[in-house]
């Protein structure tokens, strides 16, 4: 593991028990807890997968940069299998403790420890902004390598144009060195990695309070006002 990746891994090792607390401090002004945002994105991911595949229950899904596995209790019941990988061995140990049915691996931040075309869907949630920018193309290329042709790559990221998002990133202890990507940058990253039909949509334009408000939030998907966004690309053959 090179020094940059080791520094990232060591930083997140420190937050294996206090990750949620650190995020909650940063978003306290919103009146919401991290669980609400996690649930909203997990449900969005499940809807996204279901809209592209007829039988989600047969799919193999990989979470790249999975941390402590916050999204896996929502995902595991609706897909065939979930795997998670992260550079932080401490976070992976915590994730395995919380989600014993999920398969976890630690990696060095370079080559993912999986075979070519192993997964139907690969996703990452608010991960790329922790990756050094010179490694963004390599990160996307690895997600593409392990995803089968016709499969999906799904990326969730912070919207750097949203003022409250910038405040959260500034106030979050482990986001202080983050470099945020615009929607256009993420679209370009996936396209250059070998994805077609790359689409980006806003999410979390409204607070994730559930019910009607969550449904209403989807009507704003085509406007660039969400605090975060989703990028989806179909992996091409070759």
Predicted regions and their residues:
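Conserved beta-strand signature within the Rossmann-like core of class I S-adenosyl-L-methionine
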Residues: 150-157
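Short, glycine-/aromatic-enriched active-site segment of Class I SAM-dependent methyltransferases
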Residues: 159-176
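Core SAM-dependent methyltransferase catalytic element
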Residues: 213-238
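Class I SAM-dependent methyltransferase SAM/SAH-binding core
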Residues: 62, 68-111
């Amino acid at each position: 593991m090179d020094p940059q990746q080791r520094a990232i891994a060591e930083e997140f090792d420190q937050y294996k028990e206090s990750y949620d607390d650190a995020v909650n401090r940063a978003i306290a002004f919103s009146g919401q807890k991290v669980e609400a945002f996690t649930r909203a994105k997990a449900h969005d991911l499940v809807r996204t997968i279901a809209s592209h595949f007829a039988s989600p229950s047969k799919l193999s899904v990989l979470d790249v940069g999975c941390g402590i596995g916050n999204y896996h209790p929502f995902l595991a019941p609706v897909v065939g299998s979930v795997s998670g990988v992260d550079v932080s061995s401490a976070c992976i140990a915590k994730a395995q403790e919380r989600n014993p049915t999920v398969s976890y691996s630690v990696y060095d931040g370079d080559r993912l420890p999986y075979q070519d075309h192993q997964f139907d869907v690969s996703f990452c949630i608010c991960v790329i902004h922790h990756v050094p920018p010179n490694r963004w193309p390599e990160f996307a290329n690895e997600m593409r390598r392990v995803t089968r042709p016709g499969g999906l790559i799904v990326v969730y990221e912070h919207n750097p144009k949203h003022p409250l998002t910038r405040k959260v990133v500034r106030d979050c202890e482990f986001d202080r060195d983050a470099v945020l990507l615009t929607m256009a940058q993420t679209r370009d990253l996936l396209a250059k990695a070998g994805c077609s039909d790359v689409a980006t949509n806003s999410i979390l334009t409204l607070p994730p309070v559930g019910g009607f408000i969550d449904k209403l939030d989807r009507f704003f998907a085509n406007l660039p006002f969400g605090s975060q966004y989703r990028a989806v690309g179909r992996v091409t053959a070759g």
